[in-house]
Amino acid sequence: MALIIQKFGGTSVANIDRIKKIVPIIKTEIAKNNQVIVVVSAMAGVTNQLVTLCNELSSLNNISQFAEYDVALSSGEIVTASLLALALQEEDIKARSFLAWQLPMLTDNNHSKALVESITTDLLEKYLQLNTIPIIAGFQGINKSNRLTTLGRGGSDTTAALIAAAMKADRCDIYTDVEGIFTADPRIIPNAKKIKEIDFLEMLELASSGAQVLHPRAGELVMRYKIDMRVLSTFSPDTEGTLITSKDKNMENGIINSITSNKNLLKISVKSMSLSFLQVANMITQNNNHIEFMQEIKNNEEYSFITNLTDKNNLQALLTNLKDDKQIQYFTFDTEIATISLIGYGIKNDCKLLETILSKLTNDNINVHMIQLSEVKITLFINDQDTEKTIFNLYNLFKIS
């Protein structure tokens, strides 16, 4: 008997008909004599609607307001969890919904971007022994003040990975609207190939570079705890997806296996005569704002940072306060930036590879602002209007398959 965590994303639970179609997928695992725990997202579009409603009512500029914001946003997953439990019960399958405070899933106090500190699994273990399927509302936690928190965008992926780790699950299955992970975005490269099996580290680099099938925090967790994960389509449940697992790789190979892009970025330029580069960086990373790249520009007074576009409102308030206090002279935002990332083991050590890439992009009149290297990834910072062209040209140049 294996323990399987199944996570269903927003498009998988977008309406009642789709929720009903999840039931046979869960029953398939039960028929294999496996135990199942389900994690659900809000119905597609619901979280965005709740965000809009909150923004119409509040400026969201203090902790009390963000606490209420989290209560509102967490309601989407609560509705889905209860509806799926009802759908299973209608098929004579014992199931019940669980909310974060009932477990509990304890987090820190960073509302809208909370980090999970601990999960109590006693209730989950109890109901599994009673042959009852726990349906967990993803994306949410509870802090030590008994206030609901949310885990940020992609939080249901994170919930699923955390539950898999806490329960020592045999596998975590992520059900979405695509049939796995592809060598490139099929909307840009129609002949992109599905990857049958991918290493943890490659998947983490893909997720952190803009691939939409898995949130980077979930990728970090499955790699840390070595949890096998599958990415599957809710709409083609019998189709083989992509297995994320530990694989032996030749670190000297220098082969590009996939390419991805990210337009959800914000470039921040700051000038400060009183704050150091590291002081500004430390302020930006408060409240779990994530810096993708940072650079001193000149004279130890001008700094450049690239962060997630979703952090723009938080950072606008922070930097405006610093400017009002005369700790910085000015700041600017640039949203017309994107990254292209090429993923594959050994590529950092292949000098000719980078030379080939830059030569191709120069010939194509594509301006590369910055380059970032890791053992398995080359990331190019370009103008966002060149994204599709760059992906198409590099994909064909290296014949990625």
Curated annotation (Swiss-Prot):
Keywords attached to this entry: Amino-acid biosynthesis, ATP-binding, Diaminopimelate biosynthesis, Kinase, Lysine biosynthesis, Nucleotide-binding, Transferase
One term under GO cellular component: cytosol
GO annotation, biological process: diaminopimelate biosynthetic process; homoserine biosynthetic process; lysine biosynthetic process via diaminopimelate; threonine biosynthetic process
EC number(s) reported in the record: 2.7.2.4
Pfam families the record matches: AA_kinase, ACT_9
Extent of the signal sequence: none
Gene Ontology terms for molecular function: aspartate kinase activity; ATP binding
Root EC class: transferase
Family as reported in the entry's similarity comment: Belongs to the aspartokinase family.
Protein name in UniProt: Aspartokinase
Annotated gene: lysC
